[in-house]
């Protein structure tokens, strides 16, 4: 028996989020079904690096589980052959005590409709969020500490769209979608940079929540793991 980490991809439209929920099709329930078919086990010790809400996509979420199969390439191919909507992209063996949730960084991309967006203003808004802040006004509060650090947010024109790329170790619930909505509002002149700064300072200013299908978890990275 060995402990395995894998990167997985999925379209959020096919699932009611990543976390298991009774009576609903989720990414976790699909992965458990896939592993059960291939490895003939009901309890593979499955854990996820990151949770994604209903509608949110992933290109590189990470999971960990126990495997009785030694050849990980064969395992990944077998999982892909039975899965309905989850794609097993890369893998590596990990120590039993390794916690897949302790990632070095998580990279997300949010795609905005570029029509009417002033890129310079949107980029300046992105810079306001970089560094360490209390993001209480930019999350759905669930009791966790709300002060954290965003390493960078890049504002990238791409055809008719504007892509916001987020780089941080972790995020709060709904945080990226709320920040993206704020950046869009500033870029389109509906809100000011002062409004954003006021919210970061604790003032009750709402910018709404961006739609989930525009958000993709691009990658989860670990300093000590090499996926193949």
What feature does the model see in each segment?
Residues 1-228:
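Structured-RNA-binding interfaces characteristic of tRNA pseudouridine synthases
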């Amino acid at each position: 028996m060995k402990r395995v980490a894998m990167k997985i991809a999925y379209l959020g439209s096919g699932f009611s989020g990543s976390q298991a929920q009774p009576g609903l099709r989720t990414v976790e329930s699909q992965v458990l079904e896939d592993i059960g078919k291939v490895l003939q086990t009901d309890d593979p010790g499955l854990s996820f690096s990151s949770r994604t809400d209903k509608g949110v996509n992933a290109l590189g979420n990470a999971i960990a589980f126990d495997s009785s199969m030694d050849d990980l390439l064969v395992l990944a191919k077998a999982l892909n052959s039975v899965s309905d909507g989850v794609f097993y992209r890369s893998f590596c063996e990990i120590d039993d005590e390794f916690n897949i949730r302790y990632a070095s960084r998580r990279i997300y991309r949010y795609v905005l409709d570029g029509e009417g967006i002033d890129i310079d203003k949107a980029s300046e808004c992105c810079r306001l969020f970089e560094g360490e802040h209390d993001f209480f006004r930019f999350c759905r509060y669930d009791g966790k500490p709300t002060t954290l650090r965003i390493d960078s947010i890049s504002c990238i024109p791409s055809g008719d769209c504007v892509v916001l790329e987020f780089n941080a170790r972790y995020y709060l619930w709904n945080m990226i979608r709320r920040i993206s909505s704020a950046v869009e509002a500033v870029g389109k002149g509906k809100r000011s940079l002062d409004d954003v700064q006021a919210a970061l300072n604790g003032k009750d200013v709402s910018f709404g929540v961006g739609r989930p299908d525009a958000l993709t978890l691009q990658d989860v990275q670990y300093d000590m793991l090499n996926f193949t």
